[in-house]
């Protein structure tokens, strides 16, 4: 197979597939990923770990206190980060079960150059491996990735769906977006006129994966997260019409997926308010007089320690502190793992074939790690 055939085959495999609502419900009976939440799908993409019994190796036994450590092939290039990755997977497992973590922001905290951004990029790349199912009407896909199950009422329809299609009660309850509600009225309540599209999350096309960054404090507003009215559409629609709204916010695009907030605590506090209701209640308000928008995904944030300390010490931010799940991403403190990091960096540069004296990388690693070590307080050593 040449490169052109290989590319075409990959493109064809990633094309959207369309189903009727009845066909989608039949798929749910056979494939639980069709109704799984974002954390469950990310766990499927990460896969099973290789378990390492550190008691069998003297060096590792002292570092990990004889624990059995999980090493995930999906993160094999992240050296010396076993604890951080295990905490992320623990967060995802609990969020997948519908526990309190589902309502919290996953926050990577660590020093500059510790690997937070690389971890975030890998999580977003993994999110692309499992498809999502999105409502469609009149050939137009939902702009906020409405899941087909949002059409059903948890009080009225849950028992029938569980009995006929094996869909657990807890997967119902996500609200319908204003876009879907308008189409439902147009169809006269006939939900069979909706179609369901199987799409693959994409970083490139911002499908179920979005990224936002703090802007200038004077001109950044919440529209970066929740979207705003598209003035080009006001010629044809009223200002409070769902079709006049531009669903361009990061929360709109990241529904059913993952939203990355870079340097979150550098953003003005007013910009962060939609995150509270999006995580706690699964919905948030837009900037105009339309009904609430749904959010059923993961919010991933990261910043350096100095911003976190400043934010934590401000008493006005207590509401956020309770809704943050902190994963510490410290510097690597193992020489063997630090050498692997240098080798990885060299392999991705032109210096891979440059001559290097024996022991150079080991000396650099020792020096770097010694510069990171601090004398512990209350130590007898």
Q: Can you name each region flagged by the protein language model?
A:
Residues 1-52, 113:
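N-terminal accessory segments that target, anchor, or regulate ATP-driven/P-loop NTPase machines
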Residues 34-381:
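Conserved ASCE/P-loop NTPase catalytic core
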